Amino acid sequence: LAPRDLPLGVILASLDPVALDLAAVRLMGFDAARIPKIREAMASAVLPVTEVRSADDVEIAEAQDDAGRVSTSVRMYALDALGSPRPFVPHPGWLNHIEGSADENHVDGVSQPEEVME
């Protein structure tokens, strides 16, 4: 493997492992429905590891930057609002299997060039 760093400037934390995975996958530009371990964890009633059954069950809390000072202000939004301007490139074994739709690789309605997405 020859991974490339792609700094996003975020810290992820959750009490629910699937909620955390959904947020991370969304930030990476992948489609959680195409990743079996996430999809199956949300559907399992036999060994439930999560209360998350869909992306609608996840809320994102973002600490507001207060001019570089610690702030107690928090912004809440739905998982669907989360995204990244620079999607990750999956491992070759997953290439063309887990990426989000072409529409998800747009930022402000503008398609990202190939060199940015690699």
Predicted regions: what they are:
Residues 1-118:
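Acidic/aromatic/glycine-rich contiguous surface patches that form carbohydrate-binding/processing clefts
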